[in-house]
Amino acid sequence: MSAQMEEPETLGKRKESESSKLRSDETPTPEPRTKRRSLKRACVHEVAVPNDYTPTKEETIHGTLDNPVFNGDMAKTYPFKLDPFQSVSVACLERKESILVSAHTSAGKTAVAEYAIAMAFRDKQRVIYTSPLKALSNQKYRELQHEFKDVGLMTGDVTLSPNASCLVMTTEILRAMLYRGSEVLKEVAWVIFDEIHYMKDRERGVVWEESIIFLPPAIKMVFLSATMSNATEFAEWICYLHKQPCHVVYTDFRPTPLQHYAFPMGGGGLYLVVDDNEQFREDSFVKMQDTFPKPKSNDGKKSANGKSGGRGAKGGGGPGDSDVYKIVKMIMERKFEPVIIFSFSRRECEQHALSMSKLDFNTDEEKEVVEQVFNNAMQCLNEEDRSLPAIELMLPLLQRGIAVHHSGLLPVIKELVELLFQEGLVKALFATETFAMGLNMPAKTVVFTAVKKWDGDSHRYIGSGEYIQMSGRAGRRGKDERGICIIMIDEQMEMNTLRDMMLGKPAPLLSTFRLSYYTILNLLSRAEGQFTAEHVIRHSFHQFQHEKALPDIGNKVSKLEEEAAILNASGEAEVAEYHNLQFDIAKHEKKLMSEIIRPERVLCFLDTGRLVKIREGGTDWGWGVVVNVVKNSSVGTGSASSHGGGYIVDTLLHCSTGFSENGAKPKPCPPRAGEKGEMHVVPVQLPLISALSRLRISVPSDLRPVEARQSILLALQELSSRFPLGFPKLHPVKDMNIQDTEIVDLVSQIEEVEQKLLAHPMHKSEDDQQIKSFQRKAEVNYEIQQLKSKMRDSQLQKFRDELKNRSRVLKKLGHIDADGVVQVKGRAACLIDTGDELLVTELMFNGTFNDLDHHQVAALASCFIPVDKSNEQVNLRNELTKPLQQLQDSARKIAEIQHECKLEIDVEEYVESTIRPFLMDVIYSWSKGASFAEIIQMTDIFEGSIIRSARRLDEFLNQLRAAAEAVGESSLESKFAAASESLRRGIMFANSLYL
């Protein structure tokens, strides 16, 4: 295997070790540094200024609004010369004006934040530093405490020095302080929002937006962000909101230039695709593509050697791990360490790290230091927890300079890995993308083990912003002349896809603003009434972006109308009629299946070997084979159960080779075009069956061997060739003997429309262009309709309608009275933002919690906390079954009331998404005194995820205790306090190493 790779000139041409399987037979001569590095230290400064604003700063000291320069005494000096963007940022801060600093990871944004803190200290004022995650808050606290000493921390888990001049906190804590009218805010001059691009988070983005809206005008803001394409728009919103200037300082300069290499998995080495002048090398990309097998012209699904066109996640011949092994080994031999290897699956991280068992990167002296640091860190745990497998197995790995970092690790291990990495004692770190967030922990080299990731809906290519964020970890300022990025590619891909990924524009920051009951109730209960829900809606970034986009939408409509006029409309009526017949059949069949799929009708036909068609949302799995049917005990006896939600059908489905049943990938998905794929048993909810065939095939008794499962795939392919028009389906009346009048009528309607479709002249027409032209025209007309509707419907009016409907819900549930005055129930809900405030207050007031002991309370409350979904069946002990049923019934009631009040809500979806019973048994056992070693045997959820959920549960229970206290429920208050206390022990609540 040959590798083509430019080496940093400081290393010269090193002789390659004979033992390496990844040699460099051709090393280009590095260009002279002056020629090679042509990027300027570009710094763009813009400022949004309110109308009629008159600056009052003295120009000799502060420069002008358009050209800020500071000529006074610095609040803080640095041991290095500031970059242009840092100097301009300091000048803006000294003007006492808000600023957004948008720059790459490692560019030096922290220096700007530190200057704002130093200014506050100099001027005897207080400053708040917010971060999106508790773990990042802990890290930032340690860093700032080392620099400034007078620093406090408030995260919900921990409160340290709350009277300090600089307070580090999560954004949720800041929002709560703003709602409560905290006295602290009267002394605050600056609020620093770190990682402001988190504002686009679907769940939590609204917290940032509300906090920014509620901040008093006297407080100035510093926003730190990764590069984003609409920084100016964001600054204009801040200017509009607070009637004060907001500066934008943007740089895409990287202090350490990067070289980006592609590695075709199972193929021929490394190919430089983007050089350190950010030029995409097309010739190198083409050479890389040529290493992949070419598909035959007569068969798009097979390559010339009979294998699929891509190499799959596992590579062409050897396993994928061997490719990672070769790359890591080559990196170490060339002294390109430390290296961060990014994977998009936690289990994959661990598997890759374990595959390095033969490699050792640390000296004996370094091993001793690692062991000493490890033992010191473990002192925060009790004796019992120190012997956990997750801890004992980590030391040998760490001593060899290899580590894993992902959200499922024990927090103490995760923090230990971070500290060892910063000290240079971890040379190869296998991490998920969360490591690219937060503190600056750069490496010399970054490796991506895949070009695609699962985002909860589909496997998609990494976005440009994601690639920029992670690749930004490559190249250590002042240490490396160049950083190196290597991306592993497992199949042919479009040149533009890779170019856009590596060099594309970062995504814009888009508002995810939404109305919550928590917000409405808190605004209604504020005595001063300064902000109303209407005010918040009107001043949201969402509304600002909508109004700004209107002229562009108008131009788009004009262009689409021109396209619609040009499209060939000959025979349009005939094509439309044919299209409508197809649509009618699909609509009737969907309705028919929803009736057929009821357990009492369908279960007797779901015998082993039955062919069933599976559709999940927009994903069509095609035909699979039934293996087994099991009852889902976590679903109660409500309507979800009667519609089949209470049953799981284990089905053999054709899956992408990237998926494996041991959970190496987050979720199975169908194979890509041209991919061979493998058959796997996938648990499928009964309602996802979209068709039942009359055909059955023989299923081997043992499906563990790959060969046994692949024999089913061959059988399905053979049946497909025998039935080219599709597998014969079970007839609801003739085969299933369903005599229900509604179903008989539906079947007749479908057969009638099918006859019309078969008789239609378009059915046998070969004029594909006519159909395509019609479909495109229909798409264009639909898009025009949608855009016009968007222009017509004010976002403000939509939110007003939603506010009115949500207020009706609050009245029906007794949170507010007819005049909108907050009642006792509403006062309790005002204090709860960690779980569903409506549902949990319902349980508080309907007596559900009264009948439970504090262990059951802790277990039931855990259902409100987001947690990784377990792949195992939820089997609950008797003490928890009834409380869960009561919770599900209450959730269904609340969802139905919201539906009645015209809110767009799917009742069963609400119940399923709001209630997460996966840790009920675990929390119950822990609350009753079980050891951590015992409870981790009860679930397949990662240890770190269990601890994170338990800590969030403790925060939730404290909010419930405060809510009970606020409404005078002393017995409930005691119960919630006891539930919280029963959790707070051992490794679950061990102190952070940063504190």
Curated annotation (Swiss-Prot):
Keywords: Acetylation, ATP-binding, Developmental protein, Flowering, Helicase, Hydrolase, mRNA processing, Nucleotide-binding, Nucleus, RNA-binding. Residues 1-42, 290-318 are annotated as: Disordered. It is found in: Nucleus, Nucleoplasm. Residues 90-246 form the Helicase ATP-binding domain. Expressed in inflorescences, leaves, stems, and roots. Residues 323-524 form the Helicase C-terminal domain. GO terms for biological process: mRNA processing; negative regulation of post-transcriptional gene silencing; RNA catabolic process; RNA metabolic process; specification of floral organ identity. One of its GO terms (cellular component) is nucleus. Residues 307-318 have a biased composition (Gly residues). Disruption phenotype: When combined with mutations in HUA1 and HUA2, reduced stem elongation and alterations in production of flowers along the inflorescence. These flowers are characterized by the presence of third whorl sepal-petal-stamens and fourth whorl sepal-carpels leading to abnormal floral organ number and positioning. Over-accumulation of non-coding nuclear exososome targets. The modification N-acetylserine is found at S2. Pfam families: DEAD, DSHCT, Helicase_C, MTR4-like_stalk, MTR4_beta-barrel. It catalyses: ATP + H2O = ADP + phosphate + H(+). It comes from the Eukaryota. Belongs to the DExH box helicase family. SKI2 subfamily. This is DExH-box ATP-dependent RNA helicase DExH10. It comes from Arabidopsis thaliana (Mouse-ear cress). The lineage of its organism: Eukaryota, Viridiplantae, Streptophyta, Embryophyta, Tracheophyta. The gene is HEN2.
